Amino acid sequence: MILIKFGGSVITDKSRYRTFNADRVKRLCKEIRDSDEKVIVVHGAGSFGHVLAKENNLNDGFKDPSQIPAVAQVCYDMRDLNAMIVKELNDAGLPAVSVPTGSCFMMRNRELIIDDPTVLKSMIDKGIMPVMFGDVVMDTELGFAICSGDQIMERLKTIFNPSRVVFVSDIDGLYDKDPKNNKNAKLIENVDRDVLKSVETDITVADVTGGVRGKMETMLRMCSEGCDCVLVNGTVEGRLLTLLKGGKVPCTIARGE
């Protein structure tokens, strides 16, 4: 089984509120279908979640009743986005079912709690594809908090022990230098903590590298014996399919020891 996350930058236009990239999602769903692999899909929020969550400081927890309308709107927007993704998966012939994180699980001081994964395991055993997503989740300490798609990925990794974890993004992977400003920047095919430290020293443009670095940290925590974590560019047609079928594509891999 393979755990796949569609990043928000792939499935939406992050610069425009509630802008869904339907054609790209349709193609990615078909690539998953054509791989003949059993997968669990998680997706990020993109422009459906981040804008309102940031404007209303939702990740700081419950501070004031004035936040509640924003909580409701973000939850509505995320379920709307999820419904569109689930539809594309089903249209591609994949039996996908929504599992809303905020309706099914709790957090404790921003840490996702899935004490009883029986329902998720039962769905997988019956050939149903659960689709989870970043969401506003009730928090026992903070009242509520934002649960990211990456947090869900880490928790599902411990539950299902997948053979591979794939993060689908809008970039080829981690570079040794900022590729936007340096034509000699090289894609780093294999990353470990020492490599990541050297990249942090060489690259200083935080707004360009911060998201990639955070993703690499997540991948390094998740990779384990028999399970590599891969960051691949989903904006390029065929890359995800080739990767899932065992082919070589431009990407960055955190290899399990």
Segments (PLM) and residue ranges:
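N-terminal glycine-/serine-/threonine-rich phosphate-binding loop
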Residues: 1-40
